[in-house]
Amino acid sequence: MKRITGSPRPNWRAEVEQIGFSYHTIDDELYWDESGWFEFNYDQIRVIEQATNVLHAMCIEAAECVIEEDRLSDFGIPSQFHYWIKQSWEADEPTLFGRFDLAWDGNGPPKMLEYNADTPTSLFEASVVQWHWLESLQNTGAAIAQFDQFNSLHEQLIEAWKYLRQQGWDRVHFAASDGHEEDFGNVTYLRDTASQAGIDTHYIDISQVGYDSDRKTFVDDQFEPIEYLFKLYPWEWMLQESFARHLLTSKTVWLEPAWKMLLSNKTILAILWELFPENKYLLKASFEPIEGDFVRKPILAREGSNIEIVTQQQHAQMATEGPYWNQPCIYQAYHPLYRSENGYAVLGSWVVGDRACGMGIREDIQAITHNTSRFLPHRIRR
């Protein structure tokens, strides 16, 4: 694994906009950055793939343990939703995807930082944009037959939708916030993969989702019942909404399912360590401060907010601001990220269904990744 500095394509903005990637620049700063890329060999990709598959399986086992031992209160979930979440698990409601954030420099085992199991983003750039980047280089002769990419995301998403269609998911609603360009872009892409699988799709802004108490179902902006709904909107936010009580009686089936909120909550890090202590892919995690350098993470913090890195001297080496400062926290052993003269890198390893099938890499000058950290493509040397 190494970071390579190069030159962006002369017309890269037009290239990415042509394929629908409009949010390549955020607040006048580059988000998509092809002035550099990461290079791997196949052995390293196999390490990432195996780690991801093992971690996902352990997370599923951990969720089952939480349900069986009735530990949902550890996750800060209001008690009125506990039985409903258990029902979601027992009904084996399907999951589409998730993204593990891993710390790795190409040596030793990758270490799990967290699992973005509910509302993972950076999907379109991982699936389509970086693949288009690699193909365009190969078409110019710069890398003909020399490089590959860990990326079957597009194909696996279509296959996952085909499976859901076989289970009766003929029409699926998609919801996100119209005011968030990245979320809208990711949902638009997911709609396209569902359409390619033969599913009828309909988009609705999350604020326009209503509830029909007579039919006991959520409804769209045309008052049509929503049987299946993919929402790029966090479960923890939904449980705070005025309509949350209707979740308990609604016939609507959600994607991601309610049980997935257990895996996206950082409490799962401590549960994993309890179940699999000393596992090579895990970092020690606890509900109480631990010895040595550690990272303090609010259990529902998002986009790197309110994260604190604490050294052995118990002084904050780095901390970020945000709205989650008053939440319960998990303490996770600190593990260094890949570092180059350009900054720190986090590997985002994707799961579709229960299979690892792609990767995206975020880079930042700080050791805590946030929502505007740069996305760099990767390639595999054949």
Please place each PLM-identified region on the residue numbering.
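Preference for protein termini
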Residues: M1-R382
